[in-house]
A protein has these predicted regions:
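Short, contiguous alpha-helical
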Residues: 1-31, 60, 74-127
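Acidic/histidine-rich alpha-helical segments that form the ligand environment
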Residues: 34-73, 87-92, 100-102
Length: 127
């Protein structure tokens, strides 16, 4: 999951932000995470997290340089139709928060569930 977040940070979202800003109504290709599974399979989690953190810092700095009006820039999305940069930024946050929830569930399952013994029986995991 960390490799996916790292890859999405640089090769999907940042690329799209740049296209929103530099092109007039760019057309985006569908993003298919399945086609990158091999790339993620053997990734080192610490390296992926470090790469993600570096890219996130760079992306936040870049986003802060954009004028507020950039949020109204438009693009064409293959499934959603015409979208604004502002909408994509909200989707980016939802994407990341969804994966953070999954990571938290995996930590809960692997580190705490068994150690809780019978007290853990009433918990349902949703990774």
């Amino acid at each position: 999951m960390l490799a996916h977040l790292s890859h999405s940070e640089g090769h999907c979202y940042r690329t799209r932000v740049d296209r929103f800003v530099s092109e007039e109504l760019p057309e985006f290709e569908p993003d298919d995470a399945q086609m990158y599974l091999e790339l993620y399979r053997n990734a080192n989690a610490e390296d992926a997290f470090d790469h993600f953190a570096e890219q996130r810092e760079s992306n936040v700095k870049h986003l802060r340089t954009l004028p507020r009006s950039a949020g109204e820039r438009r693009a064409r999305h293959p499934e959603a139709g015409e979208i604004t940069l502002q909408q994509m930024l909200h989707e980016w946050a939802m994407h990341d928060l969804g994966h953070i929830r999954q990571i938290a569930e995996l930590v809960r399952a692997r580190k705490h569930l068994q150690a809780a013994g019978k007290l853990g029986d009433s918990y349902r995991l949703n990774p």
